[in-house]
Amino acid sequence: MIEVPDYIYERSVIKQLYLKEESRHLFQKNAYSVSISGGKEDAQFFAEASAVLTFKENPILKEEDLNDILRKLMCAGGSLEEMRVEIVFKGGFIESELRQFSSSLKQVADWLGAQIIRVSVNLCDTGEREQTVFILGSGAIKSASEAPWKRGKLYAGQDIILTGSLGKYGMTKLFSENIEELRAIYPEPYIEKLKNKRADRLPIIETDTAAFYKTTAMVPLGPGGLLAGLWSLGDREKTGLMVYADRLSYEQETIELCNHFNLNPLMLDSKGAYLLATDMGEELVYALRNAGLRAVCIGRATEDKKRVIVFDDEERFIESPKYSY
């Protein structure tokens, strides 16, 4: 793998980012530069999150491509302030594609209010033609009064709140990957309804609301669904969990597709849904619902180490994650 020449880097990265002259020294192709952002003067800790994207052609960055980074930072009590980016061109290099990428990176950074600290470009002649983008986002963690969930603590007796819809993201993936099969089963109005489903959602309402209701943890769900999220939360804090299946929130289409493909909705990718731990479950649920968000108290943390989901009179243990989609 080789680096892109300086003259290409200058015209297809630097110029596309419209960098001021005093900012150009921040860019290094071989190593991370020192951040000059620093966040708030009293900030002592930073949160970091990364994402890897792959493009087969036209590597144009969109705002939603950074959602995984944004949600992790928000759930850690931070916000995106700085971005460090590396793009690797495999199987061939077209300079116009680098220009397009740099321009789109600038637009996304401006939209998010983030500072681009580093852009590294590398070329690899071997392999199938594609572009791989590595993005590292970071930002100062807010104070405990602004983001009390930043420590990610869970205490016995606390309520566990679920926001969003379980398995919705995995359901939309199932639909897009099996649309022709589903057309033969479901009527066209149903298919059109599924086409318009949008699952990925950032915890904007949660972070705007949670600080007022003694929220001590906020966990983004994703691959492995609810079971993976519950396991991670309980295992990290060595706390038991009692969750009630009849309180869980799904959309009807999620249940129908899980039945068709014989999948467990509790394990379906639930990106866009979140778990919150709070001392004020009823009040937090009420506030979130008033803000237009689907929210429900699904259970509580317990003193013993047992982690179970209650189905009628049967308790099923929450096991170490295995995920689908």
Where are the language model's segments positioned?
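Helix-biased detector of long, well-ordered alpha-helical tracts
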Residues: M1-Y325
